[in-house]
A protein has these predicted regions:
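Stable alpha-helical elements in mature extracytoplasmic
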Residues: 51-59, 111, 145, 149, ...
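Zn2+-dependent metallopeptidase catalytic domains
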Residues: 15-40, 63-70, 74-76, 131, ...
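Sec/Tat-exported extracytoplasmic proteins
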Residues: 59-66, 119-122, 156, 160, ...
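Second-shell loop/turn segments in exported
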Residues: 41-49, 65-66, 100-102, 137-138
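Intrinsically disordered, low-complexity linker/propeptide segments enriched in Ser/Thr/Gly/Pro
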Residues: 2-10, 14, 127-192
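Extracytoplasmic/periplasmic, Sec-exported soluble proteins
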Residues: 47-54, 71, 107, 141-145, ...
């Protein structure tokens, strides 16, 4: 069973088994994080329990409703797993979407700005992965910018009370997360 991803004119197939369902199980089996974000303003109360990765998906699902595809393969994998996204006949590469006349209504624009501001505030003022010593992070969790992942890496060492780079004294879960983040930081691929 394959999941088809079309990015611009390129079509790729990913085995469904490779689609990570451990991330936000609540959301994997539902259609939207915020089903009404096209016509109802998202509130701080609704964003508070979400992780950075969940907020990123919630923000990008507004774009996805208009057929936008993404440079980040994780976002494409996420949205191509949703029946509503598969039903959109015309999908646009990021460049083609950006060249279109404005697609968003005022509520969508406000929600995008509010979610992004909340993400930025959380990145500055809160621990990125407060449970990184007790839970293995999924590929969706770590699908963040390299700057955010560098901060998260330092936070994991701090939470474990271990000097940065002293991997041998990290807990098994923290070590797995550190290695996963370091692997991303050592690639040239840019997440945003």
């Amino acid at each position: 069973n394959l999941l088809a991803l079309s990015i611009g004119s390129e079509r790729k197939y990913i085995p469904n088994a490779d689609v990570n369902t451990s991330f936000a199980g609540t959301y994997w089996n539902s259609d939207f994080i915020f089903p009404n974000s096209s016509n109802v303003k998202v509130t701080e109360t609704e964003l508070r329990p979400l992780s950075l990765a969940e907020m990123r998906i919630a923000r990008n699902e507004i774009f996805a409703r208009h057929g936008r595809q993404f440079k980040d393969p994780m976002l494409n994998k996420w949205f191509y797993s949703k029946a509503w996204y598969l039903k959109i006949n015309t999908k646009y590469s990021p460049a083609d979407f950006d060249a279109l006349p404005d697609q968003m209504n005022a509520i969508e624009k406000a929600n995008i700005a509010f979610i992004l501001k909340t993400e930025q505030n959380r990145m500055k003022n809160q621990t990125i992965f407060p449970d990184a010593s007790t839970r293995v992070l999924s590929e969706y969790d770590v699908s963040l910018s390299k700057d955010v992942l560098k901060k998260a890496l330092n936070e994991i060492y701090t939470a474990e009370k271990v000097p940065v780079g002293q991997k041998t004294t990290l807990s098994k879960v923290a070590l797995k997360n550190v290695e996963q983040i370091e692997g991303i930081l050592n690639t040239s691929e840019v997440k945003y």
